Amino acid sequence: MIRKERAILALEDGTVYRGYAFGHRGETVGEVVFNTSMTGYQEIMTDPSYNGQIVTITYPHVGNYGVAIYDMESNKPYVRGFIAREFSGEYSNHRAQQSLEAFMQQYGVVSIQGIDTRALVRRLRTGGVVKGVIAHRSYTHPEDPYGEFTPAEEQIYVQRARDHQDIDGHDMTKEVTTPLPYAFPTLRHGKRVVLMDFGIKHTIIERLAEVGIEPIVVPAHTTPAQIMALQPHGLFLSNGPGDPAPLEYAHKTAWELMGLLPTFGICLGHQILGLAAGGQTFKMKFGHRGGNQPVKNLLTGNVEITSQNHGYAVDIASIPDGAFVATHVNLNDGTLEGMAHSRYPVFSVQYHPEASPGPHDSRYLFDRFIEEIDAFEGANGSPVLKASAGRLGV
């Protein structure tokens, strides 16, 4: 019989799940959430939107196709921890360079396996997301990694989870945004679009480039004047982690540029547009995370299966003067999934049309963005209005 090093997951509500260590040996704390995707664990781990969170994968067996550098969504994992019913110690994939555990050890991802993930997910769906701690016995008791944690030790970790800072009200983007602007290399000249990086995924940049956009990625704190000085044809507000409410600098930028540039927002970018227009956001009970969320397009009547990762949503009824109208809704719970400005070429979706991982039903939105840019430029004769430059002091 193979002996396994012990580990626990301690939640702030006092629940303790006992399992086995996997990945980097240590301790970690974060907000515990779950993702229903069957594949794509590497993309999930390296998505900056998961910064500050411990992710539970509902699919029971994870890791059997290893890790391929081409599937990274950023330059490193951003998850605080990873949870699965069972991780695979072996892998089979001609594209892979290493096993999932070797990848976790390389980047310091603390994980746990062997717990009842179905029970954990039911707990999160019923009671909402909670803070939690993963602790490895080998980290605290290297002399006896196979022993059990005592009840007193478990309560220490429960208290540590309770004491951990909430994601609510905390600006998580400053930990993931690019420190300096950069241009994404493309094979052809296209429409110059400024991408505000709140935690952008590589695949989003690639999809924009594929439809004829020259992406210029800028830090989250970039001012409207700095953006307009780049003479862009459009503006893109990216995905990112955490609560959108504290990002007042981003709300201000989005508000000042609204109507001056065709604008497309995804995920956190969608929420920022809602707040910029005077609306409100709210934290969801357990959010939407997975590659199988049904969304209805209210403009066409079509249903799209979408990839999602968000714990906050926009209350469109709170946006004054009907500035935005709903374009997409979630068929599971009726929450807003997309909106468009009633007067300006500004639109956004709460989900991820680039997928990675997930279905490709909504990739048409990138083409729509180019169409909005072309129409705006044709109507105004220039990608940058003289009036806008004067308004911003450029």
Curated annotation (Swiss-Prot):
Keywords: Amino-acid biosynthesis, Arginine biosynthesis, ATP-binding, Glutamine amidotransferase, Ligase, Nucleotide-binding, Pyrimidine biosynthesis. SMART domains: CPSase_sm_chain (SM01097). PROSITE patterns: GATASE_TYPE_1. InterPro entries: Anth_synth/Amidotransfase, CarbamoylP_synth_ssu, CarbamoylP_synth_ssu_N, CarbP_synth_ssu_N_sf, Class_I_gatase-like, CPSase_GATase1, GATASE. The active site is at C267, H352, E354. The keyword Transferase does not apply. Belongs to the CarA family. NCBIfam families: CPSaseIIsmall (TIGR01368), PRK12838.1 (NF009475). This is Carbamoyl phosphate synthase small chain. It comes from Deinococcus geothermalis (strain DSM 11300 / CIP 105573 / AG-3a).
